[in-house]
Amino acid sequence: KLLDALIYEAERQGIMRYPIHVKIDSGMHRLGFTLEDMPRLSERLKSQTTVMARSVFSHFAGSDEPRFDAFSRQQIALFKECAVAVQSATPQPVMRHILNTSGITRFTEEQMEAVRLGIGLYGISACGMDTDLRTVSTLKTTILQIKELEEDQTVGYSRRGVLTRRSRIAAIPIGYADGLNRHLGNRKGAVVVNGKRAPIVGNICMDVCMIDVTDIDCKEGDRVEIFGEQ
C-alpha cells in the first residue's frame, strides 16, 4: 500500500525515476516485503518508471549472538533470493546490504555492495568481541557557572541533589530537551571535565544540568565532554 501510494503521488506530481530503497523482511518481522510479496512487487516495479529501486536491504534479528547463527544464515539466504527479484525488475544496478555492526564483524563474507555501521559508530561492539572499535563522534559543551555550596544544601528540582560535603557545583548548558537522558541525573551518570569524571548532581533540567567539580581543577568556560573518546 505504501509503495502504491508513493507511486500515485509521484505520478501526480510528474516525477520520474525517483530513487527508493526496498526493505525486505527476512525474519526480523518489523517492516518490509516478504518472500511471498516478491512476484507482486516485481510486477509493480516493472509496470512503471516513476520510482526506481536504488538499493534492497534487510536487517538481522540476532547477528550479535552465535546461538542464532543458523537463523542469521537463513535470513541471508532469503534476502539474497528476494534481492534477485528486485534486481531483475530494475534496469539499473541495485545495491544490496544486510550487515549491521555485529554482522560486519561476524559475517565478513556477506558484505555485498554496502554495510550499515550503527551502534559501532559510538565505539560499541554489539557482539562483545574485541574489535578495537573507536567512537567517531564527540559531544562537548562548556561550563556556564560554578557555585560554592555548603553541606546539606540541595541542587536542582525536588531538592534531589543533597550535598554531603562542601562542594563546587558547575552548571552546563545541556538538558533533556537536547536528548540527555533524565535517568542519568542524581549521580547515575557523569561527564568529563579536564580529563576527570564529574557526576551529574540532582535532576537533569530541560536545558541545563549541574555537575560536581569539587575535586576537579576547572573554571567557567572550560570544555565538558558529554560523550566521546574519554
Where are these regions (language model features)?
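Fold-independent oxyanion-binding glycine-rich loops
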Residues: K1, I24-D25, H59-F60, L99-S102, ...
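Active-site loop/helix belt of alpha/beta enzymes
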Residues: L3-P19, S26-T142, L149-E150
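Structural motif
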Residues: P19-H21, R54-S55, V94-R96, E113-A114, ...
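C-terminal accessory subdomain/extension
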Residues: E148-Q230
